[in-house]
Amino acid sequence: MDYKDLLFCPLDLPTPPVIDYSKFKVWYNEQLDFNKKHNVTALLADGKQEYPWEVSWALWWNTYDKPNPWICNFEKTFPELVEYFKLYPFKQFKSISFLDQKESRDVYLHTDPDNRWGMRFYLFNGLGEKLYFVKSKERLTTRLRTMVDNKYTDLWEHSQKEKLYAKFPEKRCAWMLNSLDAFHGIEKNPSPMGNRVTCVLNGDYDYKKLFELLERSVKKYKQYSIVY
């Protein structure tokens, strides 16, 4: 298949390591001050009441090329996650973040900056199948940004107006998404924070490994895949 058509698919990778949420929150609070001082994205997100997540960064664009790129000893606190990251098809990680969906909040329709193929996994997921996609009205060559000049782009009006819900082989798993030819959102989280935490991995791809992973994944999880 043409992998440009692939909008969503679970990935043929092991189940992510299990970690303790309270331990994660301790690290979250430690990295908060660092990122507020050094991470422009964190500053922009800080204090936004409408922002549906609490975001933390294990590695960011201004740390990835340092001798030790990990923020606030992430690699010592969660070595099992650092090893898990290595299974993804990147030559160089440039940003690794965690999105902790706020209680009683849905996630509005949006796109992500990794464009064509985005790598994700659920660190925690108590919501089940709440992630949905809508196809773009027509095939796009550039991503429709969620916000332009502090104004929300009504992505629904640029879509085919049909919600396609992602299904997963297990609650906690690795998966990919396409933010060029589809937009996505998440239904409301009725439970306390920590019920749904997504890891977002960005960087420079090893395309040979990427396409090998996509080929294995589509073959294994064809019944779960969403295509344009």
Please provide the spans of the model-predicted regions.
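Non-heme Fe(II)/2-oxoglutarate
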Residues: 1-90
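Structured loops at beta-to-helix junctions and adjacent beta-edge loops in soluble globular domains
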Residues: 46, 99-101, 124, 178-179, ...
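Catalytic core of non-heme Fe(II) oxygenases with the double-stranded beta-helix
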Residues: 90-174
